[in-house]
């Protein structure tokens, strides 16, 4: 992603364009699926994902000027770099937007989220969200247990969730770690 301060809703490709493979996102702890948003109420794949990952709570949120109270303030808050102490799970039922996430070198990667895309950002990962130029997304928000959506704006490197995330990022599964 480029470093331009231009409209946050634009794609912000680097020049020349650079596309990040899903394997790279997986290395950062991001999980994603492509599901059928037109039949989400009866989607067996969604049910299996929710059961396997313990996503017991869900709601649906329309993000657009006409439907979201205090729209401008909320969009500004979504785009402030932050982390959560729990996973952030979003399933795009309509519309589109971007999650910007930090890689291991603290560089931004822009992840497009479109209709049918479900994404899980790990706890402790710095990120931000913005709509694209369509200015609309209808998203299912999923949580383990009661919903907690507390953003910790950067810097909050002292939080256990951040330390655990960095440990996983720097010491991938299968790599030897020092005994304590």
From Swiss-Prot:
- GO MF term set: acireductone dioxygenase (Ni2+-requiring) activity; acireductone dioxygenase [iron(II)-requiring] activity; iron ion binding; nickel cation binding
Question: Which InterPro entries does the record match to this protein?
Answer: ARD, ARD_euk, RmlC-like_jellyroll, RmlC_Cupin_sf
Keyword Nucleus recorded = yes
GO CC, sorted alphabetically, is: cytoplasm; nucleus
Q: Which reaction does it catalyse?
A: 1,2-dihydroxy-5-(methylsulfanyl)pent-1-en-3-one + O2 = 4-methylsulfanyl-2-oxobutanoate + formate + 2 H(+); 1,2-dihydroxy-5-(methylsulfanyl)pent-1-en-3-one + O2 = 3-(methylsulfanyl)propanoate + CO + formate + 2 H(+)
What cofactor(s) does the depicted protein rely on? Fe(2+); Ni(2+)
Q: In which pathway does it act?
A: Amino-acid biosynthesis; L-methionine biosynthesis via salvage pathway; L-methionine from S-methyl-5-thio-alpha-D-ribose 1-phosphate: step 5/6
User: What Enzyme Commission number(s) apply to this enzyme?
Assistant: 1.13.11.54, 1.13.11.53
What keywords would UniProt list here? Amino-acid biosynthesis, Cytoplasm, Dioxygenase, Iron, Metal-binding, Methionine biosynthesis, Nickel, Nucleus, Oxidoreductase
In which compartments does the protein localize?
Answer: Cytoplasm; Nucleus
Residues involved in Ni(2+) binding: 82, 84, 88, 127
Could you tell me what the cofactor note in this record states?
Answer: Binds either 1 Fe or Ni cation per monomer. Iron-binding promotes an acireductone dioxygenase reaction producing 2-keto-4-methylthiobutyrate, while nickel-binding promotes an acireductone dioxygenase reaction producing 3-(methylsulfanyl)propanoate.
Q: Please list the residues that bind Fe(2+).
A: 82, 84, 88, 127
Task: State the Gene Ontology BP annotations.
Answer: L-methionine salvage from methylthioadenosine; methionine metabolic process
Q: What the protein does?
A: Catalyzes 2 different reactions between oxygen and the acireductone 1,2-dihydroxy-3-keto-5-methylthiopentene (DHK-MTPene) depending upon the metal bound in the active site. Fe-containing acireductone dioxygenase (Fe-ARD) produces formate and 2-keto-4-methylthiobutyrate (KMTB), the alpha-ketoacid precursor of methionine in the methionine recycle pathway. Ni-containing acireductone dioxygenase (Ni-ARD) produces methylthiopropionate, carbon monoxide and formate, and does not lie on the methionine recycle pathway.
Family according to the record: Belongs to the acireductone dioxygenase (ARD) family.
What the entry lists under PANTHER family is as follows: ACIREDUCTONE DIOXYGENASE
The identity of this protein, by name, is Acireductone dioxygenase 1
Origin organism is Sorghum bicolor
């Amino acid at each position: 992603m480029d470093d331009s301060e231009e409209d946050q809703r634009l794609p912000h490709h680097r020049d020349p364009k650079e596309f990040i493979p899903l394997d790279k996102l997986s290395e950062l702890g991001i999980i994603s699926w492509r599901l059928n948003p037109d039949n989400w109420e009866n989607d067996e794949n969604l049910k299996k994902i929710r059961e396997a990952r313990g996503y017991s709570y869900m709601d649906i949120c329309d993000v657009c000027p006409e439907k979201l109270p205090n729209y401008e303030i909320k969009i500004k808050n979504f785009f402030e770099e932050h982390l959560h102490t729990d996973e952030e799970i979003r399933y795009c039922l309509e519309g589109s937007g971007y999650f910007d996430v930090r890689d291991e070198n603290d560089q931004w990667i822009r992840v497009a989220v479109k209709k049918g895309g479900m994404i899980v950002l790990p706890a402790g990962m710095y990120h931000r969200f913005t709509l694209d130029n369509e200015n609309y997304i209808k998203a299912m928000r999923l949580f383990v247990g009661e919903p907690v959506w507390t953003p910790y704006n950067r810097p909050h490197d002292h939080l256990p969730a951040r330390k655990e995330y960095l440990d996983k990022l720097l010491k991938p599964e299968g790599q030897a770690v020092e005994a304590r």
